From Swiss-Prot:
Highest rank taxon of the organism: Archaea
NCBIfam families: methan_mark_12 (TIGR03281)
Classification via InterPro entries: ATPase_NBD, Methan_mark_12
Organism, scientific name: Methanosarcina acetivorans (strain ATCC 35395 / DSM 2834 / JCM 12185 / C2A)
Identification of the protein by name: UPF0285 protein MA_3856
UniProt family annotation: Belongs to the UPF0285 family.
UniProt lineage: Archaea, Methanobacteriati, Methanobacteriota, Stenosarchaea group, Methanomicrobia
């Protein structure tokens, strides 16, 4: 049987296929996907995976914040695309929308994975925040669960930083990108950002997508920053030191929540910055704990694993109810 997971990432749409023991992956840049037609999206899936659309048993989609629903469900039963609003924290390119619509408007069986928000089944104290994490992070967490870990924290560190806590195989809480630890591009609004928004110098969303550690440096993007860090340039290392410090704080805060459930769990680091050895070592030192690392494909692979297990009849994923078929 053939299952596909789709990770709506910050910079790319990543696809993973699971067929028995075989795992295949490919990605489309978000701008690249936005420029394609729905037919071209489906053709790319067929070409890259060497399959026909009719061979796919189930696709698990993630889209944007996923804050308009709280159970995994048939994508065609969603109101709109499963969002409370298209406005929010992040840059809009249209690539995720094109992929979502291509699958929904096809004959492929498909489910949508929700994000975690105030309507989700998490520790009630976390519901002070309206939104906790977008759907693809559940893909990462489910992949870790499939690896055999039931109690863990996973911090996805890249353009932004998002951290989830899982106890006994269920998500109990998460800290979203706009709340605490900054990433390279995105971060929480500080005092000056709030003043800028109030003075109408920028929108809140613009402030969010410019609040990462890149603003501390002369570099234009994540790739340039990481390249400079590899050369030992001080501004780049300071930016990574800052990310590592706040990511460690965020992980520790999730472990504090987990203590109420009798565990602190294994720590996993994911994302393009979480994969950097320099950052990993800093975080491990801050936490005085070893951390395990995941690659950039694990969100999509985890979504494919969700599709596989939902197809087999599973009615709960990480504590999230399944309303399918």
């Amino acid at each position: 049987m053939t299952f596909i997971g789709v990770d709506h990432g910050t910079t790319a749409m990543r696809f993973a296929l699971i067929e028995d023991e075989k795992v295949l992956t490919f990605e489309l840049g978000r701008a690249e996907a936005a420029a394609m037609s729905e037919k071209e999206i489906l053709a790319a899936i067929e070409r890259e995976f060497g399959i026909r659309i009719g061979d796919i048993d189930l696709v698990a989609l993630t889209y944007s914040m996923g804050d308009g629903f709280s159970a995994i469900k048939d994508v065609r039963k969603l109101e709109g695309r499963g969002l409370q609003s298209i406005e929010g924290a992040g840059k809009k390119t249209g690539g995720g929308t094109r992929v979502f619509d291509a699958v929904r408007n096809s004959e492929i069986p498909a489910i949508a994975i929700p994000g975690l928000h105030s309507g989700s089944r998490v520790d009630p104290r976390m519901k002070v925040f309206s939104h906790l994490t977008s759907p693809e992070k559940l893909g990462i967490a489910y992949h870790i669960l499939c690896l055999g870990y039931e109690d863990f924290v996973v911090s996805d560190i890249s353009s932004n930083t998002v951290t989830l806590a899982v106890v006994a195989g269920k998500v109990i809480g998460a800290i979203d990108a706009c709340i605490f630890a900054p990433g390279v591009h995105h971060g929480p609004l500080d005092l000056q950002a709030i003043r800028n928004v109030d003075d109408r110098l920028q929108t809140a969303n613009q402030a969010f997508i410019e609040a990462g550690t890149l603003k501390m440096t002369p570099y234009k993007d994540r790739e340039e920053l990481l390249k400079a860090a590899g050369k030992g340039e001080k501004p780049a290392l300071l930016a990574l030191d800052t990310i590592a410090l706040f990511a460690a704080m965020e992980i520790a805060s999730m472990q504090l929540l987990m203590k109420d459930y009798g565990t602190t769990g294994t720590v996993f680091l994911a994302g393009s910055v979480g994969e950097v050895e320099y950052v990993q070592k800093k975080i491990c030192t801050h936490l005085d704990q070893e951390c395990l690392s995941l690659g950039k494909w694990h969100a999509a692979i985890g979504c494919a694993e969700i599709a596989r297990d939902v197809s087999a009849g599973k009615k709960q994923i990480l504590g999230v109810n399944v309303d399918y078929p």
